[in-house]
Amino acid sequence: MALSHLPVGAQAGLMDTPALTALLSQTSFGASLAPETRARLAALGRVIDLAKGHVVIHQGTPSRDLGLLVSGRIAMRLGLPGERDRTIQTLEAGDVFGWSTLLPSAIATSTGITLAPSRAILFEGSSLRTAIAIDSELATAIYHRLFASVARRLEPNRTV
């Protein structure tokens, strides 16, 4: 089930744009954004609190939200045919999840499960895609940070 539908174990935190902008500035993802860009991004977000063991995204299903982990931990697991799911990465505060929502197929490539009570900022996919289509500064900032995140996640898997 998509996070945008507030599944069992999730609570939406009501937060106005200035408060969400301040929260975003405390993350590694949002701290270096220009203040105006950070405010525009914050206007698209909402805060969600998640219980331990909550599935935030499920492999093979539509990815509807881009999430930014504010606190807690999320195990990203990959399901392989005939095998148990494997944890391929553990996300920490400042990491993003659900980036598939920005791709044309928007299908999740892994499953994310909270390892502890967690808080995240969610950006609904269609609203975010519309915003980056009309705001090149916002698009550049988001894509730059997403590519950096992907590169960080791939680094431990490099073999020489």
Residue ranges: model-predicted function:
Residues M1-V160:
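Cytosolic regulatory regions built on CNB/CRP/Popeye-like sensor folds
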